[in-house]
Amino acid sequence: MDLKPNIRRKEKRNLLKGEAALEKKGSIDRKTKNKAYPSTTHDPHQNDDSNIPGLGSGLLERIKDIVQRPTDTQLKGQDSNHKKASLTETKTEKAKVKPKAKKKNSKEKISKSSKQDEHKTDVHKESVSKLSKNLESRNNRDENSAKREKNNSHQVEADTNNATEMVSSNAKKSVYPLYYDSATVKKGLKSGTLFKGTLRILENHRSAFACMEDIPDFYVDGPIARNRAFHNDVVIVEPVMNNDSPTEKSNFLQNGVEKVKIKDHDDELGGAMEHLERLEIKSVASFKGDSRTRARVVAIEKRAEISKIVGILRAPGWSLKNVEYVSKKSSYAIFIPKDKRLPFITIHKNDLSDLSGENWIENILKHHDQLFSVEITRWSIYSRYPMGVLGEKLGNITDVEAYTNALLLENGISSSPFSDEVLNCLPPDDWIISHEEIKKRRDLRNELIITIDPETARDLDDAVSCRALDNGTYEVGVHIADVTHFVKPDSALDKEAASRATTVYLVQKAIPMLPPLLCERLCSLNPNVERLAFSVFWKLDSNGKEIGKRWFGKTVIKTCARLAYSEAQGVIEGKSWDDAVGKPIGGTHTPKDVETSILTLCEISRKLRKDRFAKGAVEINSTELKFQLDEYGMPNKCEVYEQTDANHLIEEFMLLANRSVAEHISKNFSNNSLLRRHASPKEKQINEFCHFLKSMNFDFDASSSAAFNASMVRLRSTFNEELVELFENMAVRSLNRAEYFCTGDFGEKTDWHHYALSFNHYTHFTSPIRRYPDIIVHRLLERSLKNTSPGIDKKNCSLVAAHCNEKKEKSTTVQEDSQQLFLSVYIAEYCKKHDKKSMPVQAFATRISGNSIDVYISEYGISNRVDLSSDDRIKSFIVAPDDSSVKITLFDDSQKTIALTDRFQVYLYSDYSRTFFSIRCSLVSLN
C-alpha cells in the first residue's frame, strides 16, 4: 500500500510531567496481539494511574503552547518537522497587518517585542550573585582548559574503522567547552554555585530545561548551552547572568545560523551544514528566551540510556531547498533522527555498513526512503554534531510495520521471541493444578466469580465476586492471576520479565511481558477452567464502608462467566441477560445470580467512587482513541472511546485492592516495599494552567487535590463539553508523573502520597501478567503473610522501581506514537477513499500567537497548529494586541475573524513531503 506515514509525532502526554493519576479500566482491548477491534487506549485492568493520555510519544501537539510556556511562545509558530521558516525580523508593534504574496520572500511576520521579566527564586538569586563575582575567572578557566585540550591533541580521529581524519589542532576552534572535573563539580554543588538536574529537551530541539527536585527549573537555551548533553541526561548546570547567556547571540546571524567556524568533519559538509543549522535552530531572531534563570551544562553525571537511534540518511549537501544537490567534496553523510530532540548525526563514508564503497553517495540516494538505525560513537568539542556508525536497515518509511519496528528499536523495546532458556522454565502445555496445591489454598471453585474485560482480551488477570451476608453486608472479592506460582525469582523467565517490565500495546498487536502459554492460557482467568489466584476479600456495607478485617490469601477459582464491558453495561442498564449477554453460565449459577452480582457491585462502586472524590481525588477524563482494522491491518474506523459504569465498576475495585495491598506490605516491610507515588504538581506548571484559565475568566483553585477536583467540577458546569475535554487534557499536563519507588528511599511517609488518587498508600497488584512491579508486590504480599523476610533488599527494590519507571515511560511513548501513526494512515485512507486532499473537522482555537493558531480537534482528541505565514492562500492577517483574536484575509479577498475558544472548520491531511510522518492542519481546504 502506497502510504507514507510521516505524520508529526504527537507530543508525549507524560514526557513533560503529564502522567495523570487516575485508575481507569477502558473497554478497549490492549491485551491481545491480533484484535478485531484493536486499540492502544487505556485499560483499567492495568490499574495504571497514568490513564490520561500524556512525557513522549502524546495527546496534544505542542500543548505546552496552550499553557503559554514562555519558551514556546517565542518559537513563532515554527513546527518541529524541519519546515522552511521565514526568518525575517519585523518591527516590534503589538499588532500589524501581515500582507502575503504568492512569492515566499514577500511575506512579513508579526512579532511581539515586549520582554518578559526574569523570574528568580531566592536560591537562584544567591547562586547568580556568587557567580557574577567569579565570571571572569570562570571564563579564563574554560579558555585555558580548551587550550590544554588543543595542545594535547595533535590529531582528531573522525570515527572508527579506517575513517581517521588528521586535522592540525592549531587550525581548530572548539564549539563546546570542556566539562568541569569531578572536584570542581563537587565543590560547586556543595557551595550552591552548581546544580544537578535532569535535562528535558523540547521537540523544537533548541529549548531545554534542567529539571530540579526542590527548586524551579533552569532554562538551557540552545545546543551550545546544552554542551553535548542528551534528553534525560542527569546534568550539572551552572546559572549564567543575562549578559553571559550561553545563547551566543554574537555568534548567530539574523537568520539563526551559527557563525562558529568548525574545523572538523563539519567543514566537509559545506553548505549542507548551514542548512542543517537552519533546520535545527529555527528562527533565533524571533526567539525571546524564557523568564526562568538560564543555565549552561558544565558536566554530565549520568548519561540517559539511549537505544538505537532511528532516522533517515541523506547525502552530503542535501537540504529541503534542494533535495537533489550532492556535495562531492564531502566524506560525510547526514543522518536525521526521527526523535527531534536528538541532534543531526554525521557518518563517515567508511561507516555506512553495506552502503560504503566507491558508490557510497549513489547508494545513499537509492535508499532515501529507507529507515535506518545509527549508534553514536563520538562527540568532540570541536564538532557541532556527533558522529555515528550506520546500523541496520529497517524498511521503507511507507511501510507501517517497518515504522512500528523503528518505534520499538529507538525505545529499546524487545519484540524478539522468547529464548529456549526462558521457555524451558514453563510448565508443559497440558499442565493442571495438582491436588496437593489445591489443599494449600482457599477453594473458591464453587463461588460466583466473573471477569469483565475488553471484548477481544486474551490475558484475563482479574476477576470479581460479591456474596450477600447478613444485615445488608457483602463479602466482595478481587481475584488476581497467581503469576508468581510460575515465575520463580532469579529464573531465566523472571529475568526476562524483569527486563521487559511491561507488556507494550500497539494499535495492531501486543508485545507481551510473559510467554503466551502463561499470559493467554495458564494464568489467564478464562471461564469454566480452574485457575490459581491471589485474592483479597473485604466485608462491606451497601455504602462501601469496610466492616471487619481484610483477608489476603492464595486461592483456586473457576470463573463462571466472561463478560465484555458492553455486555456488563447492558445488564447495568436493565437489559435482560439474553439481550445484554446471551452467553451460557458455568456451574450451578443462573443468569439472575450473575445479574444480581453485577448490579450490587455497580452500586457499591458508585459509593466508593463518590467517597474517593469527596476525599480529594482528582477526576480528569481523558480522550482515548480506538481503531478498527481491516483484513490488511489498515485502519478503516477511528473513534473516541467513552467510559461507562461497567468501566468504573472494575476501576474502583482494582483501586481498592491496590490500596489495601499497599497498606499491608508497607506495614510489614516499611523499608523494602515497592509502592507507587504521585507528587503534587510543581508550582510553575500548575500556575501556567491556572493563568490560562484566568484568561478565560475562570478562577481555578489548585491549592490541594480536593480543591483541584472541585475546580474541575465547576469547569464542567461552566464550559461546553468539547472545551472541557480540552481543559482536562491541559490539566493532565500540569501534573507530575506517578512513579514506582522503594519505601526505604523516602524517610517521610508523606512522600508516599498519591496526589491524584488522594491515597496515602498505593501500589500495583492487579496486573501481574503484564506489569513486573505487580510480580514483586505479589511476592512481598506472600512473604508478609508467611511472616518471613521480604526477599528483596532496599537497593534492589530501588533498582527495580527505577527500571520499571523507565520502561513504562518508553512503552507509553511507543503506544502513543503507534496511535499517531495509525491516525495519519487513517486520514490518508479517508482522503483516498473520498478523492480529497484533506479531511474537514471541527476545531477550537486554543491559542493565537505570532503567526499561528493552535487548535484542539475533539473528534480525535488531538491538538495541532495552523501556520498562517506558510499558507499561500492567506493574503494577510492581523493579530489583536492581546492575542485574543486574528483577522484573516484570503487571496480571494474573503475575510474571517477567529477568537479564542471559537469553533471553526479546519482541514487535516497527512504530509509525506518532509521527513517522517506528520499530521498537518490547514485553515483552507486543499481540495
UniProtKB/Swiss-Prot annotation:
GO molecular function: 3'-5'-RNA exonuclease activity; metal ion binding; poly(U) RNA binding
An example Gene Ontology biological process: nuclear-transcribed mRNA catabolic process
Protein name: DIS3-like exonuclease 2
Record function comment: 3'-5'-exoribonuclease that specifically recognizes RNAs polyuridylated at their 3' end and mediates their degradation. Component of an exosome-independent RNA degradation pathway that mediates degradation of cytoplasmic mRNAs that have been deadenylated and subsequently uridylated at their 3'.
Matches recorded under HAMAP family: DIS3L2
Family recorded in the similarity comment: Belongs to the RNR ribonuclease family. DIS3L2 subfamily.
Cellular component terms per the entry's GO annotation: cytoplasm; cytosol; P-body
Required cofactor names: Mg(2+); Mn(2+)
Cross-referenced PROSITE patterns: RIBONUCLEASE_II
Primary localization: cytoplasm
Annotated InterPro entries: Dis32-like_C, Dis3_CSD2, DIS3L2, NA-bd_OB-fold, RNase_II/R, RNase_II/R_CS, RNR_Ribonuclease
Source species: Schizosaccharomyces pombe (strain 972 / ATCC 24843) (Fission yeast)
Residues at which Mg(2+) binds: D453, D462
Subcellular location: Cytoplasm; Cytoplasm, P-body
